[in-house]
Design a protein with these regions (language model features):
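Glycine-rich NAD(P)-binding loop of the Rossmann-fold in SDR/ketoreductase-type enzymes
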Residues: 113-128, 159, 163, 167-170, ...
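Conserved Rossmann-fold NAD(P)-dependent oxidoreductase catalytic core, especially the SDR/UDP-sugar
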Residues: 101, 127-164, 181
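Amphipathic terminal alpha-helices
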Residues: 294-314
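Glycine-rich Rossmann NAD(P)(H)-binding loop
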Residues: 188-192, 211-220, 241-249, 258, ...
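Mid/C-terminal beta-alpha module of Rossmann-like enzyme folds, strongest
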Residues: 228-274, 279-280
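N-terminal Rossmann/SDR dinucleotide-binding element
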Residues: 1-95
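NAD(P)-dependent short-chain dehydrogenase/reductase
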Residues: 151, 162, 174-224, 257
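NAD(P)H-binding glycine-rich loop region in Rossmannoid oxidoreductase-like domains
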Residues: 76-121
Length: 314
């Protein structure tokens, strides 16, 4: 199958590109580099805004970006250096059998500060590829379309986004049609995540002698995310699906696995109460999904092992 992956140099996109390249012909559309909006910035609260990253944060971001680029080098994927919202020259509508749309501003909290790029990369990019190409797409939307919630919610829950990122993700969904699949993930984590890797957060807080904030929220490990997408491609059934593992982030697990001592502060969600979960039973039932990892601790052990191996190669 000929597959186009927009945002294929990003966290989720690079993993999908690498794995799907084993059985498909992959083309990547992405213009990511170190000038990417927000790469050298990090959110430090409403008072400080988005100042430049520290040397420690820069180190972690660099090694994760390098990891993603190495994944692509190991594949046979061809890379077109442009954004999906720009004019596309290779515009034969029958060029691809499938598009996986991962393009978009990578961090929701930055949508307030990079609003134009957020809109262009999420909304205009989706409209552009849906206008040009006739094949179905897997559109990577976000649980942020629901805004804030409590308890467990399914795909019919009221969509009430609370920030520009969520609004743009919801807006972008309208370009999808009856042959497409929309995925709404929550907190995807793992090796290659350069925006806010777990280990960067722990180490910078240790450096500042401050507690590590951990929100007990739903999430999904990148390895499981990729396996689910492979399953979806093999058993296509159009529709909108929540995608999560229902494994809850746990600061005590991080304390157990990370070798240095640190204090955990259990953070509440934006409502002042524990953040809600996604009901992903529709996805699991439709595609017969089985997760590779049964516990949050298993994913964190795997993540930390890969991270330390990556760090040792620097």
């Amino acid at each position: 199958m000929n597959i186009l992956i927009t945002g294929g140099l990003g966290f989720i996109g690079s993993h999908l590109s690498y794995e799907l390249d084993k059985n498909h012909n992959i083309t990547i559309m992405d213009n990511f580099d170190l000038n990417y909006p927000g790469y050298a910035k990090i959110f430090r609260g409403s008072k400080q805004g988005v100042p430049r990253i520290s040397k420690l944060e820069e180190f972690h971001r660099e090694i994760n970006v390098k990891y993603r680029f190495e994944l692509i080098k190991k594949s046979k994927a061809s890379v077109h250096r442009q954004w999906s919202f720009e004019k596309i020259s290779y515009n034969n509508p029958l060029l691809y059998d499938l598009i996986i749309n991962c393009g978009g501003l990578s961090e929701a909290i930055l949508s307030k500060y990079f609003s134009e790029f957020c809109f262009d990369s999420i909304v205009k990019g989706t409209e552009n590829i849906k206008t040009i190409y006739s094949c179905p797409i897997i559109h990577i939307s976000s649980s942020m379309v629901y805004g804030s919630w409590e308890g467990k919610i399914d795909e019919d829950y009221l969509q009430k986004p609370v920030d520009k990122y969520g609004f743009n993700k919801l807006y972008s969904e309208q370009f999808c049609d009856e042959k497409d699949i929309i995925l709404r993930p929550i907190h995807v984590y793992g090796i290659g995540d350069s925006k806010f890797p777990i280990w960067m957060n722990i180490e910078r807080q240790i450096e500042k002698d401050k507690p590590v904030n951990v929100e007990a929220a739903d999430c999904i490990y990148i390895d499981d995310f990729v396996e689910i997408v492979k399953n979806i491609i093999a058993n296509w059934m159009p529709g909108t699906y929540n995608i999560s593992s229902n494994l809850i982030r746990d600061g005590q697990v991080l304390q157990k696995i990370y070798p240095k001592d640190f204090i955990v502060n259990n953070k509440l969600g934006p409502t002042g109460k524990p953040r809600g979960m996604l009901d992903s039973s529709k996805l699991f039932d439709t595609f017969g999904v089985k997760l590779k990892y049964n516990t949050y601790e298993e994913t964190i052990r795997d993540y930390y092992g890969k991270y330390e191996n990556l760090r040792s190669q620097q």
